């Protein structure tokens, strides 16, 4: 999933130089570092103190503003603060998307974009969800995931006053199957959902 996302998403982000960007659910800074390298002024927000510490190490404390916060609560950010918001592989962990989209719309500047990448909800039919290994314990962790239909994203965004600019579904192709034996079992299934909303 990450390989497919990292191949497809950058082309949708455009020129970020000089933009104020919010990385929602930034985790360990996988995208935060790329956003900073692209010349953006970046704020990363995540509920996990440990992940934010890793993001700070990856990006550099002086390069980014990192905020510890639960996305289920109103964002501790000012109205109209951002030109672009990125939510990469995060929203499946949010139970109700509507309050989050209202908050994202609130912190958008006029004509700002909200870019969302997400595991396609069809993957839940295959009992596939986010999983990672905790480096401290060595245990596999499966955070709570919600199989939001595509319409949940669209309706939450429209309800928050955003418009739909882009929606695409991406399958595992032959290139990914060659690069990853695990990817082959998902051939023919939509794996990645990409959406862009406009304020």
Predicted regions and their residues:
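Conserved alpha-helix/loop element of class I SAM-dependent methyltransferases that forms part
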Residues: 1-19
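Class I SAM-dependent methyltransferase SAM/SAH-binding core
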Residues: 22-24, 28-73
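A short acidic, Gly/Pro-enriched loop at the edge of an enzyme's catalytic core
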Residues: 75-84
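A short SAM/SAH-binding and catalytic strip from SAM-dependent methyltransferases
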Residues: 84-97
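A short glycine-rich, Lys/Arg-flanked "PGG" loop and its adjoining helix->strand segment in the class I
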Residues: 98-113
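Conserved class I S-adenosyl-L-methionine
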Residues: 113-139, 144
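Short alpha-helix
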Residues: 145-168
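Conserved Class I S-adenosyl-L-methionine
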Residues: 163-199
């Amino acid at each position: 999933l990450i390989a497919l996302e990292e191949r497809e998403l950058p082309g949708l982000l455009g020129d970020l130089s000089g933009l104020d960007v919010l990385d929602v659910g930034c985790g360990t800074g996988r995208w935060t570092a790329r956003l900073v390298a692209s010349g953006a002024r970046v704020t990363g927000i995540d509920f996990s103190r440990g992940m934010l510490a890793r993001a700070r190490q990856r990006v550099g404390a002086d390069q980014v503003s990192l905020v510890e916060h639960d996305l289920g609560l109103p964002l501790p950010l000012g109205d109209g603060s951002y030109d672009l918001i990125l939510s990469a592989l995060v929203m499946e962990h949010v139970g109700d998307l509507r309050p989050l989209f209202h908050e994202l719309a609130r912190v958008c500047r006029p004509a700002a974009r909200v870019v969302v990448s997400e595991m396609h909800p069809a993957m839940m039919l295959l009992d596939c969800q986010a999983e990672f290994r905790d480096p401290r314990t060595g245990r596999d962790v499966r955070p709570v995931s919600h199989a939001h239909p595509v319409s949940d994203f669209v309706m939450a965004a429209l309800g928050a006053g955003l418009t739909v600019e882009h929606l695409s579904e991406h399958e595992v192709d032959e290139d990914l199957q060659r690069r990853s034996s695990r990817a082959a079992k998902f051939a023919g299934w939509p794996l990645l959902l990409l959406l862009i909303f406009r304020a």
